[in-house]
């Protein structure tokens, strides 16, 4: 069935099993480009073909994931994905670039599917949507094999890139293109449920999982941009890159559990982890690293358990810089130090504030411009951001993150993607420094919505939101103890 996460609709099925995994080494990706029969429907974005030149609003050198979306462009997207996972796993996991291939081999080629785009995600026809998405995956693989005899056994993961935008974001208005294709992780259960087969047989190879992704997440490249964003003060601020969605989908494929409620779409760890809202940090080109728990689960880090009553210096996030504090035999805290600085003491927001203040105007430079000009990111010749010096740049602040982990909840719910299903009983819970449990709850604040996480959730000296919850701490370092808000109370009240 379809599941959603506030800003996206995706399909999730499958089992995970244990409380640890060995997500190491590298994987080879088979990328298949597919297009649709041409159409001029208003319910989908684009014509059904890949974008070879921009048709929308010109953001000049600040364009995210610019056209042409040809073979080189998708190779750059795979390089960006590799840079992300190499960085956040400390070189323990990544993409085998040499062993990954984009098909077909021609620069502007694609495999033409038998229907228009809207067939594969018909509006309000919930009873057939999942089956049609599965058919898209099946038809893409079969068509590619028929035309190019691809040896799928040479690859670890199949990624179908389709023409058009993903049906993955909530917009601040009625969605004008509801029949765009949702980004999807397809696994064996989904194939079995919809095709009545254990997998898709191609020659002697059985394919039982894969990913479906759009060519872009940037609406501003398409002719619909003017009607959608033409009245915005700065339309270019509505751009998003593909890397975040790509990393999220690959996260599922390699076994990282989702950390939001996949049935309601409600956030649980917000912008502070890849497997929730953090996939779209930094306008989708700087996704957040997985949470401390996820990195330990993947085998990328081993936490340090300090002696009782000891004092520790906690460096910035790096391999081995997670502290584990036991609470009970099943519960413990994981503490990490995260920084969104582009250079010591300087964040993207502080640069914007300084430039705006010095200009004596009421406006500040756009986030997207400062992100691309001043954060040290690297764009390649295809205009894709392929390297980022620090994937914490997209966080709302710098400081400690304190995670409350309950292995009993995790072990009983991980098989059904339910680690954080119940907001009142979560396996991985962020101790929000402002003393409130905002993440995942509906917000009454129109402009400063904390329900996905904000600066006040991080632990740092000078956090005004912490002081509001703990007035006696004004001027002092924040403290986390039995009499603070939040407190160190265990889930059973001890």
Q: Where do the PLM segments sit?
A:
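Extracellular low-complexity, Gly/Ser/Thr-rich intrinsically disordered linkers
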Residues: 317-494
């Amino acid at each position: 069935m379809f599941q959603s996460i506030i800003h996206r609709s995706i399909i999730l099925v499958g089992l995970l099993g244990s409380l640890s995994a060995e997500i190491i080494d590298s994987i080879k990706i088979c990328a298949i480009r597919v297009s649709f029969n041409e159409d001029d429907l208003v319910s989908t974005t684009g014509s059904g073909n890949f974008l070879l030149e921009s048709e929308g609003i010109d953001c000049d050198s600040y364009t995210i994931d610019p056209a042409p979306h040809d073979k080189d462009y998708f190779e750059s997207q795979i390089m960006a994905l590799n840079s992300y996972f190499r960085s956040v796993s400390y070189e323990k996991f990544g993409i085998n670039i040499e062993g990954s291939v984009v098909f077909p081999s021609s620069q502007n080629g694609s495999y033409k599917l038998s229907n228009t785009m809207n067939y594969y995600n018909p509006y309000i026809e919930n009873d057939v949507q999942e089956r049609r998405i599965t058919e898209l995956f099946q038809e893409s693989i079969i068509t590619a094999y028929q035309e190019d005899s691809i040896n799928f056994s040479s690859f670890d993961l199949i990624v179908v890139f389709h023409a058009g935008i993903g049906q993955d974001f909530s917009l601040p208005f009625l969605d004008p293109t509801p029949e765009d294709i949702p980004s999807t992780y397809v696994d064996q259960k989904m194939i079995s449920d919809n095709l009545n087969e254990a997998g898709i047989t191609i020659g002697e190879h059985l394919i039982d999982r894969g990913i479906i992704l759009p060519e872009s997440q940037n609406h501003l490249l398409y002719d619909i941009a003017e009607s959608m964003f033409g009245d915005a003060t700065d339309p270019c601020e509505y751009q998003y890159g593909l890397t975040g969605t790509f990393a999220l989908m690959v996260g599922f494929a390699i076994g990282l559990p989702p950390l939001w409620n996949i049935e309601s779409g409600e956030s649980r760890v917000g912008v502070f982890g890849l497997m929730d809202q953090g996939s779209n940090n930094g306008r989708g080109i700087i996704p957040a690293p997985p949470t401390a728990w996820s990195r330990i689960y993947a085998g990328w880090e081993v936490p340090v358990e300090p002696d009782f009553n000891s004092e520790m210096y906690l460096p910035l996030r790096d391999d081995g810089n997670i502290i584990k504090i036991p609470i009970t035999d099943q519960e413990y805290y994981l503490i990490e130090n995260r920084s969104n600085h582009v250079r010591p003491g300087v964040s993207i927001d502080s640069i914007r504030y300084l430039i705006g203040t010095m200009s004596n105007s009421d406006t500040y430079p756009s986030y997207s411009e400062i992100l691309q000009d001043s954060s040290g990111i690297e764009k390649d010749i295809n205009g894709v951001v392929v390297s980022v010096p620090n994937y914490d740049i997209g966080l709302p602040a710098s400081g400690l993150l304190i995670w409350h982990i309950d292995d009993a909840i995790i072990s009983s719910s991980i098989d059904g993607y339910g680690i954080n299903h119940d907001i009142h009983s979560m396996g991985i819970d962020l101790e929000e420094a402002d003393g409130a449990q905002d993440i995942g709850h509906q917000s009454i604040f129109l402009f400063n919505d904390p329900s996905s996480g904000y600066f006040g959730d991080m632990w740092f000296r000078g956090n005004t939101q912490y002081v509001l919850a703990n007035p006696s701490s004004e001027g002092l370092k924040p403290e986390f103890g039995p009499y603070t808000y939040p407190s160190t109370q265990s889930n059973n009240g001890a």
